[in-house]
Amino acid sequence: MKLVCRVLTLGLVLSLAAPALANTEQATQSATEFYQAYRKAFAKAQKIEDILPMMAASQRAKMEKTPADERKMMFGMLKEMTAAQGDVKVLKETATKTGAELTLETKGEKGTATIIKEGGAWKLDKESWTSK
């Protein structure tokens, strides 16, 4: 009986601690680390809806207003372009009032990513690329 009580108590403690630990990890994650996680998630995504939670609310709203067939086509084009980029290197992270601006580089291109904080979590607001 004591063992059952201990197991239940441990389970309760762990269930209460897990969300707190996740929030701590999110709070200590840098904008660069978030962006790298975003790129990995994007590479694995099968549809744009898979990455919408990582996008800023304004960008999510634009995507959600786009007709489903156009969204699918745009996502396919983005997948091709990001795959062609290969590995992206973050050269610099600059703090801003709303989050951070990342200076990026990949083979043949330079880019920037605007990462903002929404509800205490990092979100991708904008990303742009130009040829070197």
Residue ranges and their predicted role:
Residues A100-K107:
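Short beta-strand segments that buttress and anchor functional surface loops
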Residues K110-K132:
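Short beta-strand edge/turn micro-motifs at domain boundaries
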Residues Q29-E33, A37-K44, I48-E93:
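Short solvent-exposed beta->alpha transition segments
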Residues M1-T9:
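Bacterial N-terminal signal peptides that target proteins for export
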Residues T94-T98:
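Ser/Thr- and Asn-enriched, surface-exposed coil loops between beta-strands
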Residues A17-P19:
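N-terminal signal peptide c-region/cleavage motif recognized by signal peptidases
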Residues N23-Q26:
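Boundary of Sec targeting at the N-terminus
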